[in-house]
């Protein structure tokens, strides 16, 4: 595509009236002019695409792909490239031997990987399905219905000191606040605290108790009021679940779709606003910056933001109605893009700076201490500058971020009836969010032609967000491989999913024997049996 010969109308953004606002991959080339990667911090506007897509017209072949002619929607499925990272399963420990052993035949290496690594996506599944109703088959006291300890992820015995916790962590916190708690970590104050290793480091265990919200004032006086609320909430949930169990299987999905259709674009935007995650604070590394200290701060921040991101996704109307497999797959596919989109929004009013957190603001030049991260900083600053040129509004940002999540993985791996129904719900939800974005742009008062141009400009920038996220993922994996920074918990699980996805992508692109090819197809069609 000839970028330099694009019409002049694309070089300057359309005038945008924000006075009517009512609400406060893989490896590829990217076109960034030289003025975007020099030492200056303020970047001019850059033209990305030819005007062929500016009219927002959907090609005729898209209608055929979607199963015949029908009502044309404003969904950006044809403007927005679909990702390649699609993870059918998640591993729960580090894959260090992937980097230590010599390269072998692609399909042989991946086959041995699947047989030797434990298939475990418990962390992500537990967080995604945390507020689902109990199964009618299981009783209220079964483990399937139980809460988990916020400190070590063991089964919780109750609500102690302000959080759900097990008896062991409850007793440990009680001893710590009543006696001496001058514990010292023998390592780097980053020990993993889980069910099996919670006794290995008292200092890190106490630190995590405070991080998850344990407080000294979780006393008997609070317990009575909490029990009343908990008893009422439990009764409401049981009634709600019983009502859902009595409905016929064909009526419930239709009712949920009608509820989503009943939401006006304005109400959907208000819901997205209420779902926004809180700001995460992280201590700024002490000067002078080192590669280890900066990467430690960034990975700790990412791990905390991932927890809030899962809660945010579950508050999007209709997301929890998707199958658990689709929810996990979407989050695995887009988490880095969502984090980077939030970073760009926080940095949009601060040219030349990246606002990772309110207390972690970095200049471009401060990234020189980390090998390879300066290129990612330049890409983030360039794309943020383009959003600034377009005068991105908060309501537009809310819709765009939700679209990143919902459009992150469009090709299902299975063809079961329930999964086909989930894919249909996903497309319906994506169309609803897209219509909300169209409504937000229309409320600005600009002409119809300018509305189409603005919508296309916003959606086309998302491919650059995707490219930056791929570079960021590659860099983080490289840092983990070199043991520059340890990676734990949910961030580790997401990274391992990315590694396994990369192995499967190499299998698809290479020549395999027919027997192995048929086995891989059977495995992809039955992911739950693996």
Swiss-Prot record:
GO terms under cellular component: chromatin; intracellular membrane-bounded organelle; mitochondrion; nucleoplasm; nucleus
Modification Phosphoserine, positions: 87, 105
Reported impact of residue 87 to D: Abolishes repression by activated ErbB2/ErbB3
Keyword Transcription on entry: yes
Phenotypic consequence of residue 84 to V: Found in a patient with a 46,XY disorder of sex development; uncertain significance; no change in positive regulation of DNA-binding transcription factor activity
Disulfide bond entries: none
Signal sequence bounds: none
Effect of residue 87 to A: Enhances repression by activated ErbB2/ErbB3
Start and end residues of each stretch annotated as Disordered: 507-530
Principal location listed in the UniProt entry: nucleus
InterPro entries assigned: ER-beta-like_N (IPR021064), ER-beta/gamma (IPR028355), Est_rcpt/est-rel_rcp (IPR024178), NHR-like_dom_sf (IPR035500), Nucl_hrmn_rcpt_lig-bd (IPR000536), Nuclear_hormone_rcpt_NR3 (IPR050200), Nuclear_hrmn_rcpt (IPR001723), Znf_hrmn_rcpt (IPR001628)
Gene Ontology molecular function, alphabetical: DNA binding; DNA-binding transcription factor activity, RNA polymerase II-specific; enzyme binding; estrogen response element binding; nuclear estrogen receptor activity; nuclear receptor activity; nuclear steroid receptor activity; receptor antagonist activity
Keyword DNA-binding in record: yes
Zinc-finger ranges (NR C4-type): 149-169, 185-209
Domain NR LBD per the UniProt entry, residue ranges: 264-498
GO biological process: cell-cell signaling; cellular response to estradiol stimulus; estrogen receptor signaling pathway; negative regulation of cell growth; negative regulation of transcription by RNA polymerase II; positive regulation of DNA-binding transcription factor activity; positive regulation of DNA-templated transcription; positive regulation of transcription by RNA polymerase II
Chain residues forming the annotated DNA-binding region: 149-214
Effect of residue 426 to R: Found in a patient with a 46,XY disorder of sex development; uncertain significance; shows a higher positive regulation of DNA-binding transcription factor activity
Localization of this protein: Nucleus
Keywords carried by this UniProt record: Activator, Disease variant, DNA-binding, Lipid-binding, Metal-binding, Nucleus, Phosphoprotein, Receptor, Steroid-binding, Transcription, Transcription regulation, Zinc, Zinc-finger
Post-translational events: Phosphorylation at Ser-87 and Ser-105 recruits NCOA1.
Function summary: Nuclear hormone receptor. Binds estrogens with an affinity similar to that of ESR1/ER-alpha, and activates expression of reporter genes containing estrogen response elements (ERE) in an estrogen-dependent manner.
Subunit record text: Binds DNA as a homodimer. Can form a heterodimer with ESR1. Interacts with NCOA1, NCOA3, NCOA5 and NCOA6 coactivators, leading to a strong increase of transcription of target genes. Interacts with UBE1C. Interacts with AKAP13. Interacts with DNTTIP2. Interacts with isoform 4 of TXNRD1. Interacts with CCDC62 in the presence of estradiol/E2; this interaction seems to enhance the transcription of target genes, including cyclin-D1/CCND1 AP-1 promoter. Interacts with DNAAF4. Interacts with PRMT2. Interacts with CCAR2 (via N-terminus) in a ligand-independent manner.
Entry similarity comment: Belongs to the nuclear hormone receptor family. NR3 subfamily.
Description of its domains: Composed of three domains: a modulating N-terminal domain, a DNA-binding domain and a C-terminal ligand-binding domain.
Protein name, as recorded: Estrogen receptor beta
Species the sequence originates in: Homo sapiens (Human)
Lineage per the UniProt record: Eukaryota, Metazoa, Chordata, Craniata, Vertebrata
């Amino acid at each position: 595509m000839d970028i330099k010969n694009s019409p002049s109308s694309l070089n300057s953004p359309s005038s945008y009236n924000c006075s009517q606002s009512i609400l406060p991959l893989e490896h590829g080339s990217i076109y960034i002019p030289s003025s975007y990667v020099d030492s200056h911090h303020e970047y001019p506007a850059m033209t990305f695409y030819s005007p062929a897509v500016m009219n927002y017209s959907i090609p005729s072949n898209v209608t055929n792909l979607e199963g015949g002619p029908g009502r044309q929607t404003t969904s950006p499925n044809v403007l927005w490239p679909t990702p390649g990272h699609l993870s059918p399963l998640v591993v729960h420990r580090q894959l260090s031997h992937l980097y230590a052993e010599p390269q072998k035949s692609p399909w042989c290496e991946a086959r041995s990987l699947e047989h030797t690594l434990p298939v475990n996506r418990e962390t992500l599944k537990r967080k995604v399905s945390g507020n689902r109703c109990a199964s009618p088959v299981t009783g209220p006291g079964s483990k399937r219905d139980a809460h988990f300890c916020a400190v070590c992820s063991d089964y919780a015995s109750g609500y102690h000191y302000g959080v759900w916790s097990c008896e062991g962590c409850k007793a440990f916190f009680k001893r710590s606040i009543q006696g001496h708690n001058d514990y010292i970590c023998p390592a780097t104050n980053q020990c993993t605290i889980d069910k099996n290793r919670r006794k290995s480091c008292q200092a890190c265990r106490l630190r995590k108790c405070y991080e998850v919200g344990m407080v000294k004032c979780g006393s008997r006086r609070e317990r009575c009021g909490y029990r009343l609320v908990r008893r009422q909430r439990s009764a409401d949930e049981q009634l709600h679940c019983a009502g859902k169990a009595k409905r016929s299987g064909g009526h419930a999905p239709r009712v949920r779709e009608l509820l989503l259709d009943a939401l006006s674009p304005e109400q959907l935007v208000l819901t997205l606003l209420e779902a926004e995650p809180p700001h995460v604070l992280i201590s700024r590394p002490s000067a002078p910056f080192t590669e280890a200290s900066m990467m430690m701060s960034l990975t700790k921040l990412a791990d905390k933001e991932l927890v809030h991101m899962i809660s945010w996704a579950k508050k999007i109307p209709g997301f929890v109605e998707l199958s658990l497999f689709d929810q996990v797959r979407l989050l695995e596919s887009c988490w880095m893009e969502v984090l980077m989109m939030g970073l760009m929004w926080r940095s949009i009013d601060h040219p030349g700076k990246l606002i990772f957190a309110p207390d972690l603001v970095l200049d471009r030049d401060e990234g020189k201490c980390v090998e390879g991260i300066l290129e990612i900083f330049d890409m983030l600053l360039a794309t943020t500058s383009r959003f600034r040129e377009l005068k991105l509004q908060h309501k537009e940002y809310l819709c765009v971020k939700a679209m990143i999540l919902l459009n992150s993985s469009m090709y299902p791996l299975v063809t079961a009836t329930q999964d086909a129904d989930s894919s249909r719900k996903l497309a319906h939800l994506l169309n609803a969010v897209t219509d909300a974005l169209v409504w937000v742009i229309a409320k600005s008062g600009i002409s119809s032609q300018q509305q189409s141009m603005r919508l296309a400009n916003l959606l086309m920038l998302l491919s650059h967000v995707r490219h930056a996220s791929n570079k960021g993922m590659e860099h983080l994996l490289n840092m983990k491989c070199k043991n520059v920074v340890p990676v734990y918990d949910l961030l580790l699980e997401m990274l391992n999913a990315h590694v396994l996805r990369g192995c499967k992508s190499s299998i698809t692109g290479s020549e395999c024997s027919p027997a192995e090819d048929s086995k891989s197809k059977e495995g992809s069609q039955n992911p739950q049996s693996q």
